[in-house]
Design a protein with these regions (language model features):
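Secreted/periplasmic proteins
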Residues: 1-97
Length: 97
């Protein structure tokens, strides 16, 4: 999968300072995300389809495979994408590298 569309959400503050699946310390101010399949370290361009705002995040965590959302981003990424208040947005994901 090099690109996909679906719903993005942002992490709850309860994860701040906890370890991600790859061992990093989670930081809401970073530009990182969780995905079901993209390899750790992948750079993924996330575009909010409602406003066309984009941000590139690094995958450093995993989501459950049966999750209805396709990506879980930090609060910083959600702010830059313009959906921090709504809590979720329909997005396009594009694997950059």
């Amino acid at each position: 999968v090099l690109a996909e569309k679906g719903m993005a959400v942002h992490y709850s503050d309860k994860f701040q300072g906890k370890k991600t699946a790859n061992g990093d310390i989670f930081d809401q101010n970073g530009l990182t995300a969780a995905h079901t399949k993209f390899p750790y370290g992948s750079q993924v361009k996330v575009t909010n389809l409602a406003n066309n705002q984009s941000v590139v995040v690094t995958i450093n965590d995993r989501m459950r495979r049966r999750n209805k959302n396709i990506i879980d981003v930090t609060s910083r990424a959600a702010t830059e994408l313009g959906f921090i208040k709504k809590g979720r947005a329909r997005v396009n994901l594009e694997l950059v590298r």
